């Protein structure tokens, strides 16, 4: 699993999730139509979010109510991010949080190998898969 977009905010509002979709749009190849998974937060059920997903040709997937296991891969990444980076530093501003997230995502995608991806990084794994298509 590769992290493609991440935004930070003081509150989980529409500006946050729509900003994440804007960032994601700049990184997706035109031919890709991935599944985007979320919990059942009100911002993910809003008409503006769902319209934006449709406009970007993304497939929406939502966890069932009260079932954290539906998003196990995403929860695993959040746990790793907290354990490997965020719990080890003291951050004083939203800008510092955003910078730490960007640094971690680069490391996670390009340097940190995963045994579940044949002991390679998410970017190398994706590139190998795409080369076979």
Task: Label each PLM-derived region with a short phrase.
Residues 1-133:
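Charged DNA-binding/catalytic regions of mobile-element recombinases
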């Amino acid at each position: 699993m590769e992290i493609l977009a991440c935004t930070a905010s003081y509150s989980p509002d529409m500006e946050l999730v729509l900003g994440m979709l804007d960032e994601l749009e700049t990184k997706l190849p035109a031919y890709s139509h991935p599944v985007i998974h979320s919990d059942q937060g009100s911002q993910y059920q809003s008409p503006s979010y769902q319209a934006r997903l449709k406009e970007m040709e993304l497939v929406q997937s939502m966890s069932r109510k009260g079932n954290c296991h539906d998003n196990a891969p995403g929860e695993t990444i959040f746990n790793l991010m907290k354990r490997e980076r965020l719990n080890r530093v003291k951050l004083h501003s939203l800008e510092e949080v955003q910078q730490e997230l960007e640094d971690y995502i680069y490391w996670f995608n390009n340097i940190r190998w995963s045994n579940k991806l044949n002991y390679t990084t998410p970017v190398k794994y994706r590139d190998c898969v795409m080369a076979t298509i």
